[in-house]
Amino acid sequence: MQRIVLGVDGSDGSIQAARVAGRLTADLGAELTAVHVRHVAPIALSAAPVAVASDPEETLGAIEELARKRTAQTLDPLNIPWRFQVRAGDPAAELEQAAAEQRADLIVVGSQGHTVVERLLLGSVSTRLTHHAQRPVMVVPLT
C-alpha cells in the first residue's frame, strides 16, 4: 500500500479517521493526501461548525480552514509527509475521483461528519463510498 486518500471536513469523525490514516501512513511508509471537498448545500451551511457569514464563500472558506487546521493538528505530530487538497462538488464522488487520479490504494473516511438532518437529506459519504468506490474504503468509527 503506497498511497492513501483521507476525506476530511473538520468534524470529530474526520479527525478520528486522520489519526488512523496517519498511523497507517507512518507504519507503511505511504503517501497521504487529505482531501476536503467544498459541498454547497443550504442545509450544510445552516449546520456549519463555524459562524455562518452572509457570504456563502466566506462560510465555505471558514469551514475549509477549520478542516485544514484540525487535520494539521492531528497529522503534524506524527512527522509524516502529507498534503492537503481542496476540491468542489459531491464529497463521495470527489473523494473517489481524487483517489483515482492519485492511484490511491485506500480511501479513509470517518463514519460521521454530517448532522442527522444532513445525513437524511444528503446521504452518508462513507455509505456511498463503500457501495460505489472502485477501491478499498476504510470507515473509521467515532470512539
PLM segments and residue spans:
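Small/aliphatic-rich secondary-structure junction motif
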Residues: 2-53, 78-80, 102
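Structural beta-alpha unit
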Residues: 20-23, 73-107
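General small-molecule cofactor/ligand-binding pocket signal
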Residues: 33-35, 83-87, 138
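Short secondary-structure boundary segments
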Residues: 36-37, 110-112, 141-142
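A short acidic, glycine-rich active-site loop
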Residues: 52-66
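Short beta->alpha linker loops
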Residues: 66, 86-90, 112, 143
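Glycine-rich, Arg-bearing micro-motifs that act as flexible, cationic patches
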Residues: 106-131
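Short, acidic/small-residue loops that bind anionic groups at enzyme active sites
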Residues: 132-142
